[in-house]
């Protein structure tokens, strides 16, 4: 029997989401948090590098690049060729990431070279108290043997800031607009050169030096020291966080993070104010729904399919990576599970046609100050439940069949649901839905909880919609196989 997750027992779903968000400043940390929750709930980790030995009625997960995760529970009545019932979301959000050479010294300041990731509202990153988080590749030597590990790092205190230009030096900013040049304006300030020089850095060899003195240093094994690429002041903080010498840092993927924690807010405590709601809110709701829909052996007793959640990286930049939705990761998961029980390749093709994907990505709520940005008959409201997204040009993968099935689940469980199409005179965004629908051939509905300030450093959604999303996804896992048997489209 799966264990009750001690991390979430007795905690309201909105508070649990807050915990998830605050533990997940990056996609790497979100996957780490997801792994902890799955393991607490009896899920067993498998590796794509190994052969799989799967059993009916058991729960498993695997990760790719530690930024994508696929978790699944196999019904006790499953046979190869039966369907997969999947909720897919993504772990990444727009942010500013450190460049491979981030050391910038300019006008008496130490700045950090960054590049924008995704389509962020970059003006919202100005005048925020910023920290750094991500993953670091560390060299380890034990008993003369060298190995390398990846470690997650998070500096929680505010160490950087992107300051705006005073209005006295830009008199027309309020009339002409705040125009951000992401190459020259978006660099966070780390320290002044004078203070950095006074606050000397202890190098690995025991000498004391500043950035200029340690430039080009070599480690004991001859590799270029990271001080030649990054401010030693920053490296010292990273090394201190993960408990290694600065010279053992081989490489990293780091990003700037807002230090303000996620909160339940509003005069009626009805909102969640947070970064990365797009799309960690849907990632959390789908993950919790899967865990709770498979919490005991009895939940899988009469299940003839496989219940699955897939959380992908790199949606915000097109999904074309080894761990994005455009990669074979979804197809690989379906294929490996099916072939574990029967190697006949025809069964996978049958299974895909019996499968269903809920592509879950946050939706645009009607904005009270910009109501004209929504089509008059399609205005999703907060507290209105999940939004089903439609687009005639297939920017969303929803069709009448997939929309009907998802609405039927809502109707059975008395859950609200809404519809959305973008205005005809505005471009339409997209999701992992069309990518997986076309790449795998799986029936798909695109949905999402309504939110405001999408792609800002600080977004907002409604507490009620978190609850509705979780309940809708959980009902999908529990009811879909029975509901799907009642509709026939292709004979």
Curated annotation (Swiss-Prot):
Names of the cofactor(s): Zn(2+)
Record-listed substrate binding positions: 168, 315, 361, 364, 389, 396
Binding-site positions, Zn(2+) 2: 278, 316, 455
Superkingdom of this protein's organism: Eukaryota
Pfam families: Peptidase_M18 (PF02127)
InterPro entries, per the entry: Peptidase_M18, Peptidase_M18_dom2
Co-factor note (free text): Binds 2 Zn(2+) ions per subunit.
Record keywords: Aminopeptidase, Cytoplasm, Hydrolase, Metal-binding, Metalloprotease, Protease, Zinc
Reactions it catalyzes: Release of an N-terminal aspartate or glutamate from a peptide, with a preference for aspartate
Compartments it resides in: Cytoplasm
Subunit structure: Tetrahedron-shaped homododecamer built from six homodimers.
Alphabetical list of NCBIfam families matching this protein: PRK02813.1
Name listed for the protein in its UniProt record: Probable aspartyl aminopeptidase
């Amino acid at each position: 029997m799966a264990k009750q997750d001690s991390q979430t027992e007795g905690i309201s779903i909105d508070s649990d989401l807050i915990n998830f968000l605050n533990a997940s400043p990056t996609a790497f940390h979100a996957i780490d948090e997801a792994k902890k929750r799955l393991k607490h709930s009896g899920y067993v980790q498998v590796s794509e590098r190994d052969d799989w030995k799967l059993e009916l009625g058991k729960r498993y997960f695997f990760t790719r690049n530690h930024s994508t995760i696929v978790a699944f529970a196999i019904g006790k009545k499953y046979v190869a060729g039966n369907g997969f019932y999947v909720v897919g979301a993504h772990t990444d959000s727009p942010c500013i990431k450190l460049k491979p050479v981030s050391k910038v010294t300019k006008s008496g300041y130490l700045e950090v070279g960054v590049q924008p990731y995704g389509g962020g509202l970059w003006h919202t990153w100005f005048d925020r108290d910023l920290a750094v988080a991500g993953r670091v590749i560390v060299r380890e030597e034990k008993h003369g043997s060298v190995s390398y590990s990846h470690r997650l790092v998070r500096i929680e205190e505010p160490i950087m800031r992107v300051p705006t230009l005073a209005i006295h030096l830009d008199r027309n900013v309020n009339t002409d607009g705040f125009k951000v040049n992401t190459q020259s304006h978006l660099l966070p300030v780390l320290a002044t050169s004078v203070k950095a020089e006074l606050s000397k850095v202890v190098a690995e060899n025991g000498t004391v030096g500043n950035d200029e003195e340690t430039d080009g240093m070599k480690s004991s094994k001859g590799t270029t020291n990271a001080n030649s690429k990054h401010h030693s002041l920053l490296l010292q903080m990273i090394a201190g966080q993960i408990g290694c010498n600065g010279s053992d840092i081989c490489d990293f993927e780091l990003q700037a993070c807002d230090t303000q924690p996620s909160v339940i807010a509003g005069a009626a405590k009805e909102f969640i104010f947070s970064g990365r709601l797009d799309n960690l809110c849907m990632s959390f709701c789908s993950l919790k729904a899967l865990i709770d829909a498979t919490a005991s052996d009895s939940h899988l007793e009469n299940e003839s399919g496989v219940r699955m959640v897939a959380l992908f990286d790199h949606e915000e930049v097109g999904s074309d990576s080894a761990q994005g939705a455009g990669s074979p990761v979804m197809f690989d998961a379906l294929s490996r599970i099916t072939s574990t029980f029967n190697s006949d390749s025809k069964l996978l093709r049958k299974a895909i046609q019996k499968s269903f994907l809920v592509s879950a990505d946050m939706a645009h709520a009607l904005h009270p100050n910009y109501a004209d940005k929504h089509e008059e008959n399609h205005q999703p409201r907060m507290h209105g439940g999940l939004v089903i997204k439609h687009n005639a040009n297939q920017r969303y993968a929803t069709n009448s069949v997939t929309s009907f099935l998802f609405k039927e689940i809502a109707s059975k469980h008395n859950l609200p649901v809404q519809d959305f199409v973008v205005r005809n005179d505005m471009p339409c965004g997209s999701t992992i839905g069309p990518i997986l629908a076309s790449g795998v051939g799986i029936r798909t509905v695109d949905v999402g909880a309504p939110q405001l300030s999408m792609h800002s450093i600080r977004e907002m959604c409604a507490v009620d919609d978190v609850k509705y999303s979780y309940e809708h996804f959980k009902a999908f896992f529990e009811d879909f196989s029975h509901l799907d048997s009642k509709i026939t489209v292709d004979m």
